[in-house]
Structures are given as structure tokens and as C-alpha cells.
Amino acid sequence: MKKKIILSSLTLAGLRWLAISDYFFKYAMTTYKKKPESKELSGRDALYRDKLGFKEFEKQEWILRVDSNISLYANYLDNHSKKTTILLHGFMSDGDSMAGFAKMFYDLGYNVLLPDARAHGRSSGEYIGYGWVEKDDILRWIKKAIGYTGDDTQIVVMGQSMGGATAMMVSGLKLPKQVKAFIEDCGYSSIANRFFNPA
């Protein structure tokens, strides 16, 4: 009888652990697809004017085919410039969430590329890499931007949160000479910091 109680308790504890582990894995690692915006922009938003201005920009849709299963999407704002900024969004967001920065850089004379990270927004992919897989995707976007604007272009990469961590990972790669600067806004230094010390 005592063995049955202990065995039942251990089995129940194991099943609970599996259920909790499954929940957190799905939350942390699986795809995030933004639902269409149903509410209007609020005038109380600090970046209201910039976001409103961003909505009025003519955007090109760029697509990168990484392999047979992965297609990455981005919006590109062509400012007919030799300066380009690539803006990297955070976890559970998409490229358009960087609209305030996009308007600012556009007004400063930059072309602006706003990619949706793998498994975010319109981009496909099943799992989120928290910057590790995405760093290679951003290198592909950099090369595509150079191909579009020419070898004499200058590129700035800016990321926020997960995008900031991705930007710092990209900065450690062998990069084309056209990449001139990185801006990192509140990225994390490790996955543990991302989950256990959120901003």
C-alpha cells in the first residue's frame, strides 16, 4: 500500500513537471504571430506622431528565402539614400513595432529596413532563437541591403530587447565593410537574464 502511494505521488509529480515544462517551452520558444491591429493609435502614445507618420510611408515588402521551409519578411522604406538602418524588434513583436525609430531615421535621411524576426510577424519558422539563429538572418538582410543600395552604402544596425541582443551577436560576426555602427537598446546578455530578470 505504501509503495502504491509513493509511486502514485511520484507519477503525479512527474506529470505535473512535464505539463509545466511543456507550457514554458511553448511560451518561450515557439512562434509568435501578431494578430491584425484592431484598435486605432492612441494620441496618448508618446510616439503617436511618429507611428502615424510611419503608417503613411510607402513600404516595399522584401522577402528572404532562407531554405525550403523558412521565408523571412521585412518592410523597406526607400529614402533614395546611401545610408541604411536595419531595425531589430524585441520578443513577441514585429518589425513595425519599431515605427517610431523608423520615422526618426527616415527623417535623418536613412533608408529603413524593418525585418520580422524568424517565427515573428509575417516571417515563418517554428522556434525563436533569441538572437542566436537570427544573427545569421540579419547578416543576410545586410547583404540584401548592400545589393539594393550599392557597395558605397553605409549601414547602421539597431536593436531593442531581443533585437538588441541579436544586434550584439551580429556585431561579433565577420561583416561587410559597409556596416558602420551598432545601437543596442536594453538587450540581454544571456537567456537566463532574459527570463529571470526581465526589464
What kind of feature is each model-predicted range?
Residues 82-90:
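Short beta-strand element of the alpha/beta-hydrolase
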Residues 149-161:
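Alpha/beta-hydrolase fold nucleophile elbow
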Residues 128-149:
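Alpha/beta-hydrolase active-site loop
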Residues 169-199:
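Hydrolase active-site cap/lid region
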Residues 102-124:
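Conserved alpha/beta-hydrolase
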Residues 61, 67-77:
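A short loop-to-beta-strand scaffold at the N-terminal edge of the catalytic core in hydrolase folds
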Residues 90-104:
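The serine-hydrolase catalytic nucleophile loop
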Residues 4-64:
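An N-terminal hydrophobic leader/cap segment in hydrolases
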